[in-house]
Amino acid sequence: MSEAHTFHPTVLREYDIRGIVGSTLTAADARAVGRLRHRGRPAAVRKTVCVGYDGRLSSPELEAAMVDGLVACGLHVLRIGLGPTPMLYFATRDREAAAGIMITGSHNPPDYNGIKMMLGKGPVYGRQILDIGAIASKADYVSGEGSSEQLDIKDAYVERLLRDDDGTRDLTIAWDAGNGASGEDPAPPDREVPGKHVLLFDEIDGNFPNHHPDPTVEKNLVDLKAAVAEHGCDIGIGFDGDGDRIGAIDHLGRVVWGDQLVAIYAADVLKSHPGATIIADVKASQTLFDEIARLGGNPLMWKTGHSLLKAKMAETGSPLAGEMSGHIFFADKWYGFDDALYCAVRLIGLVSKLNQPLSELRDRLPDVVNTPETRFQVSEERKFQVVQEVEGRSSRLMAEGADVNDIDGVRVKDADGWWLLRASNTQDVLVARAESGTRRSWERLKGMVVAHWKPPASRPFLRGRRQLH
């Protein structure tokens, strides 16, 4: 029986579907998403869909409801079971399925969960996600007799991951899965890549008892840093909750941030793809874009968001893209989706074959002073108003000699450095950053941000740190 369904107004987001389980996101929502094969385009969707889920406590229930919805509209479902999101992406490509659907809360708090989707080879985002709400509200489905079966794709995924391991010497590596879906099974790199491995928190536990699985927050890397120091590791690798974002530590215990990793990868990729377009999001350090150009590549600044970067890669034929958040995408030898396990294999191979420590690769980039990604809570309406107000001053800023990029918020660059204000597409927050080569100039750029928008007195614009972040 087809019944109209209404989603909570907060769950249909720009890049995915997410909410608080039992409050804004329920099994009924998952089943409604499963009914996506609606009357308006039944011929556009082939019969097979891959479905997977992460290690959150609510994920099995949501996965079962999703499969129920897909089967109810006549689709054949390949259930890949528990594992990281990239394994679901791989299964969808490997089996040439019509779509892939992942139940995952990614790096959100334990009481959250969500749904990431791909249609064919591309991500589902923006208007496509909002369309799901319109379809469900009208009960605009087709009915049919579908089916489902279990698919064990893990061995094939691991084999394909390891095919691009081109290291020439063994390393000592610490791994922190954060009790997320990259632990236990398949856990390929931390058991199959040659070398010595130190494993942290690889038991999958949706309570996340040791630390939150977000390697872009430095406090979540404390245990990994300690393991690197204790065991004399060459590299420390951290994963987020569903294995599509990577964090890294060098042998000195320093964090190698997402944009620094992209610069390291770009040096390798551009050897086989000279002059290629390398994409990074608007939050990334200017040193990354300068380094890509120095290496002979074509740097392209683009909107933040894993779905948006994947789409831009496909449009431009880029072999590499990445975000400051640790979403990194290879399309030179890989499939163009964000896979932290694959990124780990490539990073280990680079350090091994170049016979250089990760710290030296990191230190090729110049020192800068910058803020981390700073978020200020504002209303949904106000966050866009602030950005529009700054955009309205673009002519004056350019007349003063600044370069203004409004591809995603407002990024203003002058002789001293740059500052950014953008509205988050997933939360009621404004995102701000500032970066310069000297502390004095950096203080001036921070003042520019404050002049254009007064942050709350309780949350001053943050102190800087050496090296890009």
UniProtKB/Swiss-Prot annotation:
Pfam families: PGM_PMM_I, PGM_PMM_II, PGM_PMM_III, PGM_PMM_IV. InterPro entries: A-D-PHexomutase_a/b/a-I, A-D-PHexomutase_a/b/a-I/II/III, A-D-PHexomutase_a/b/a-II, A-D-PHexomutase_a/b/a-III, A-D-PHexomutase_C, A-D-PHexomutase_C_sf, A-D-PHexomutase_CS, Alpha-D-phosphohexomutase_SF. It catalyses: alpha-D-mannose 1-phosphate = D-mannose 6-phosphate. Its cofactor is Mg(2+). It comes from the Bacteria. Binds 1 Mg(2+) ion per subunit. Gene3D superfamilies: Alpha-D-Glucose-1,6-Bisphosphate, subunit A, domain 3 (3.40.120.10), Alpha-D-phosphohexomutase, C-terminal domain (3.30.310.50). The active site is at S106 (phosphoserine intermediate). PROSITE patterns: PGM_PMM. The keyword Phosphoprotein applies. Its EC number is 5.4.2.8. Mg(2+) binds at S106, D240, D242, D244. PANTHER family: PHOSPHOMANNOMUTASE (PTHR43771), PHOSPHOMANNOMUTASE_PHOSPHOGLUCOMUTASE (PTHR43771:SF2). This is Phosphomannomutase. It comes from Azospirillum brasilense.
